[in-house]
Amino acid sequence: MPEDTIVTLFALSIEAETAAREFYEGLLRLFGHNPRAARVWEEMRSDEEEHVRFLEEVRARLTPEQLQEPADPEMMRKLRNVLKFSPQEVLRGLRDLNDAYHYAHELEHSEINTVLEFIIHEYHIDPALRVQLVDTYLQAHVKRLLALGGAAWRRSVLANNPPG
């Protein structure tokens, strides 16, 4: 089996961030009737879109030689694990905002962010921006989820088209 390269690392990272964006787009469709939830899901969707742009920009700055270097096997394992996530499958099973919150929380604490942080540290050229990027890209998501309030309120906000 050929060794994974940096080009594959970036391709799979972009695929994972795109799946996360699709998940938040789906949450926006399901909970857009609630302004508070809609604001959070739109911000999260926008962030995932920004992650894709960031990854594309960093990849574009790498030389062809760098792109053909071997990728970190542990990061590739984590990415392949993340890519098992199916936004459509999860969205079909959501009944209320509390369900959505828990899946979003799980996604934000998954290996997708570990890989993004790895890429920021390994491939982003400007060290002064690294800490800012990690805070902006990763920690802001967790803070946004807190805006969705407590579990009792989240359970009271039903999805537009709950299953069943």
Task: List PLM regions with ranges.
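Non-heme di-metal
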Residues: M1-G164
